[in-house]
């Protein structure tokens, strides 16, 4: 099929879907390309981001975390966005696209529940029906977000197959869409999946990096030495990285979840520890068994518990433009507690992975003068019960 936009990032990406979905993807690509050139669409999207979601979000300088060091650390506060995370940015864009295509229903998948909440709020606002697939295990560990979705009128459908987590929810959502795309739009939650989703999601998250660049230049008069973001599927990270890719002086650092440790096999770090394969409609690194079956991923944070990664991250890694590292559950939990106690900000466990790596960089060389920005992709209200149970089991509370 001829596409309007390049479906690949280097060797990664593509449209590996059943033939039945090709017309839906083509229609979506056409709607996106025309919307990008339509001033009325852009004006409505910008208005929603500003007056409904609360953009621009703050760039907060840490007062206490860097004390006694020569690092200056800023947090890009996506946690302050309506809905509690960066997810709200791109769902507003996709919901407007759905309406532009004449769709009346939204199908979505969610892991941590943040994309589900964002999808539910966008549908409530714009008058769309909403059904959300969520792994049964994730429903258990993210009950506040499940209730939020239902409060806003969404139908939350538990998925019991496989590991009952995000990858299984993705499979069910795609299955649903293949039979309902005449009336429904699949609102994919991350910068992964078949073309054109990775490009659409990046463009609808790009303002994170654009705002960060303008804000840091205003506050510090120069670009940061590095921007750091957690990577599951990779939407918050690509939103932060996109506007800095051509600024080669700026390091791009993506942080995957090492879970219980890479050597344990219980992690979610396919970029550095997976093999290239085809899954979820794309060619990208993924966690596989020796037989080529998709392996279960694991992370303390439901939003990073995904066995593959967006194709643009795979490309940035392959050409050496971005560096990808990993952080364990314990390191993320420590960073979570550190930010709470030292700055009065409760971060999402996902974002805590990025913060943990920044703190590691600072600790390794306290005398190094460096300007760092961490994308605080979401707030941690959804995680307080998980953290409470862990700390209680350890006798820390």
UniProtKB/Swiss-Prot annotation:
Enzyme category, top tier: lyase
Entry annotated with the keyword Nuclease: no
Keywords assigned by UniProt, alphabetized: Amino-acid biosynthesis, Aromatic amino acid biosynthesis, Lyase, Pyridoxal phosphate, Tryptophan biosynthesis
Protein name: Tryptophan synthase beta chain
Chain's gene name: trpB
Catalytic activities: (1S,2R)-1-C-(indol-3-yl)glycerol 3-phosphate + L-serine = D-glyceraldehyde 3-phosphate + L-tryptophan + H2O
NCBIfam families recorded: trpB
SUPFAM superfamilies: Tryptophan synthase beta subunit-like PLP-dependent enzymes (SSF53686)
């Amino acid at each position: 099929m001829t596409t309007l936009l390049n479906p690949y990032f280097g060797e990664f990406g593509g449209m590996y879907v059943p033939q039945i979905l090709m017309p839906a993807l083509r229609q979506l690509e056409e709607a996106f390309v025309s919307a990008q050139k339509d001033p009325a669409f852009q004006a409505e999207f910008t208005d929603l981001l500003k007056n409904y979601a609360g953009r621009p979000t703050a760039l907060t300088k840490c007062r206490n975390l860097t004390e006694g060091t020569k690092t200056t650390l800023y947090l890009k506060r996506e946690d302050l966005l309506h809905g509690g995370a960066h997810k709200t940015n791109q769902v507003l864009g996709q919901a407007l696209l759905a309406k532009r295509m004449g769709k009346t229903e939204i199908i979505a998948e969610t892991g941590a529940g943040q994309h589900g909440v964002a999808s539910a709020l966008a549908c409530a606002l714009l008058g769309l029906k909403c059904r959300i697939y969520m792994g049964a295990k994730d429903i258990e560990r993210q009950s506040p977000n499940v209730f939020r979705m239902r409060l806003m009128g969404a139908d939350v459908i538990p998925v019991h197959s496989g590991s009952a987590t995000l990858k299984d929810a993705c499979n069910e959502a795609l299955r649903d869409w293949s039979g309902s795309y005449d009336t429904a739009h699949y609102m994919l939650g991350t910068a992964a999946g078949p073309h054109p989703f990775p490009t659409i999601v990046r463009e609808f998250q790009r303002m994170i990096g654009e705002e960060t660049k303008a804000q840091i230049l205003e506050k510090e008069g120069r670009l940061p030495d590095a921007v750091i973001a957690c990577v599951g599927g990779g939407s918050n990270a690509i939103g932060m990285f996109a506007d800095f890719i051509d600024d080669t002086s700026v390091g791009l650092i993506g942080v995957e979840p090492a879970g219980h440790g890479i050597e344990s096999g219980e992690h979610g770090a396919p970029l550095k520890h997976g093999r290239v394969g085809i899954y979820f409609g794309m060619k990208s690194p993924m966690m596989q068994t020796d037989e080529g079956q998709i392996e279960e991923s694991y992370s303390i944070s439901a939003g990073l518990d995904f066995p593959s990664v967006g194709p643009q991250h795979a490309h940035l890694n392959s050409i050496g433009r971005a560096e990808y590292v990993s952080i364990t559950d314990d390191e993320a939990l420590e960073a979570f507690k550190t930010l709470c106690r030292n700055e009065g900000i409760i971060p999402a466990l996902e974002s805590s992975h990025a913060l943990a790596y920044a703190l590691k960089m600072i600790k390794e060389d306290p005398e190094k003068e460096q300007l760092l920005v961490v994308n605080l992709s979401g707030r941690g209200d959804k995680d307080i019960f998980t953290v409470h149970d862990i700390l209680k089991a350890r006798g820390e509370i």
